[in-house]
Amino acid sequence: MKRTGLLNSELSYIISKLGHFDALTVCDAGLPIPEGVQRIDLAVSEGIPSFIDVVKAVLMEMELESVELAEEFKDVSSDRHDELISVLEMESAQRGKDIPVDYVRHVNFKLNTKKSVAIVRTGEFTPYANITFKAGVVF
């Protein structure tokens, strides 16, 4: 049994297989998951697990190039958006490098998820609480 870090075997395996610029999406309970994209469904009930908790777990193991968010997230769910930005800023400081944040319209965000290697569904009930991580390289 794994003792630390990311305990979900499917998610840990997907992250270990990512190459430079591969995409991994973490989403709220309502984001449609395109046919053909692997679904890792962690949702148990409302808020369990939370979007932020899953984001933090992914950040423990994934090297990042950038992230993508929906523009609407800033206005519709500003508290959760600000919490996420704070997490990303802390992670950026720990890594000693910027994590660029790209914003797109939600309709385009959903279209872009078709390119994700996998989509991780959380129990989050906050509108637009979705993020796509673009994999970086460790060297």
Swiss-Prot record:
The active site is at H20. Substrate binds at D28, H106, Y128, A129, N130. It catalyses: beta-D-ribopyranose = beta-D-ribofuranose. It is found in: Cytoplasm. The keyword Isomerase applies. Keywords: Carbohydrate metabolism, Cytoplasm, Isomerase. InterPro entries: D-ribose_pyranase (IPR023064), RbsD-like_sf (IPR023750), RbsD_FucU (IPR007721). Pfam families: RbsD_FucU (PF05025). Its EC number is 5.4.99.62. It is an enzyme of class 5 (isomerase). GO terms for cellular component: cytosol. GO terms for biological process: D-ribose catabolic process. Homodecamer. Catalyzes the interconversion of beta-pyran and beta-furan forms of D-ribose. Belongs to the RbsD / FucU family. RbsD subfamily. This is D-ribose pyranase. The gene is rbsD.
